[in-house]
Amino acid sequence: MMKQKTIAKEFSVTGVGLHSGVDVSMTVKPADIDSGIVFRRADLTPVVDIKVTPSSIKEAIMCTLLTKDGDQNLSVSTIEHLMSAFAMFEVDNVLIEVNAPELPVMDGSSYEFTQLLKQVGIVEQNSARKGIKILKPVRVEHEDKFAEVLPSDTLKYEFKIHWDHPVIAATNDHIVFEYDLDEYIKMVSKARTFGFYEQLAYLHQNNLAKGASLDNAVGVTNEGVLNEGGLRYDDEFVRHKLLDAIGDFYVGGYILGHFNCFKSGHTLNNKLLHAVFADKDAWEYI
């Protein structure tokens, strides 16, 4: 029997919001059994708690955003990198206090979160872990993109990207990853978010990527990568999309299945979660 888990002690970080450009402080605290993962907007009066659940997802551009009762003013966004780390460390119960509507982006990957989780430690709790097992395929599509989850006895992720862009097209576009914490830390967690330099002005006009820099993202032009050290992995682009997807799908909690995505992003990932939980015949509790 798998047990629920939380962190052994709290930790705090500061950083900048990727899209808002605002300085953010965040403290992650242990939580009791069956608490789930809860974000607390400590900057609001009274404070607002937003539980991580598919029903809290609100459609957003270029990130995953959760709201309290659908209220855009009571929200927390860009949670996917932290959630990705939580998924791999099997964290079930935790309280995240944040003083802004967006999490700090750190270096654009989940690596710093993995190191903090290793540092504070993970503890088992005296209650069975709750999750679901996929019994039949569930798939969502948009144009030529799709995201699906298939029955599997192991937790597995597969991602394929396709960009008509000379730099990204020159890299490996496909990755398969079976759950393994050490492998995740080594081969996935350091992959950074990326963006196209030519789109930066447009993004800023739409209040996006205001906190983006070469310290927290891979900058891409038609000629190459702007970051002085280049890419961390030859196929960093597809690895980061995998990192994001792991975090997005963990909004649904522990789901045993084989996730398979083609050109999927946050919107399609989130739609897949909704489709899974809407079809009661597609899964069973474990």
From Swiss-Prot:
<comment type="similarity">
    <text>Belongs to the LpxC family.</text>
</comment>
<feature type="active site" description="Proton donor">
    <location>
        <position position="266"/>
    </location>
</feature>
<dbReference type="GO" id="GO:0009245">
    <property type="term" value="P:lipid A biosynthetic process"/>
</dbReference>
<keyword id="KW-0443">Lipid metabolism</keyword>
<dbReference type="InterPro" id="IPR015870">
    <property type="entry name" value="UDP-acyl_N-AcGlcN_deAcase_N"/>
</dbReference>
<dbReference type="GO" id="GO:0046872">
    <property type="term" value="F:metal ion binding"/>
</dbReference>
<dbReference type="InterPro" id="IPR004463">
    <property type="entry name" value="UDP-acyl_GlcNac_deAcase"/>
</dbReference>
<feature type="binding site">
    <location>
        <position position="81"/>
    </location>
    <ligand>
        <name>Zn(2+)</name>
    </ligand>
</feature>
<feature type="binding site">
    <location>
        <position position="244"/>
    </location>
    <ligand>
        <name>Zn(2+)</name>
    </ligand>
</feature>
<dbReference type="Pfam" id="PF03331">
    <property type="entry name" value="LpxC"/>
</dbReference>
<feature type="binding site">
    <location>
        <position position="240"/>
    </location>
    <ligand>
        <name>Zn(2+)</name>
    </ligand>
</feature>
<comment type="function">
    <text>Catalyzes the hydrolysis of UDP-3-O-myristoyl-N-acetylglucosamine to form UDP-3-O-myristoylglucosamine and acetate, the committed step in lipid A biosynthesis.</text>
</comment>
<dbReference type="GO" id="GO:0016020">
    <property type="term" value="C:membrane"/>
</dbReference>
<keyword id="KW-0862">Zinc</keyword>
<dbReference type="GO" id="GO:0103117">
    <property type="term" value="F:UDP-3-O-acyl-N-acetylglucosamine deacetylase activity"/>
</dbReference>
<keyword id="KW-0441">Lipid A biosynthesis</keyword>
<protein>
    <recommendedName>
        <fullName>UDP-3-O-acyl-N-acetylglucosamine deacetylase</fullName>
        <ecNumber>3.5.1.108</ecNumber>
    </recommendedName>
</protein>
<dbReference type="InterPro" id="IPR011334">
    <property type="entry name" value="UDP-acyl_GlcNac_deAcase_C"/>
</dbReference>
<keyword id="KW-0444">Lipid biosynthesis</keyword>
<dbReference type="InterPro" id="IPR020568">
    <property type="entry name" value="Ribosomal_Su5_D2-typ_SF"/>
</dbReference>
<keyword id="KW-0479">Metal-binding</keyword>
<keyword id="KW-0378">Hydrolase</keyword>
<comment type="pathway">
    <text>Glycolipid biosynthesis; lipid IV(A) biosynthesis; lipid IV(A) from (3R)-3-hydroxytetradecanoyl-[acyl-carrier-protein] and UDP-N-acetyl-alpha-D-glucosamine: step 2/6.</text>
</comment>
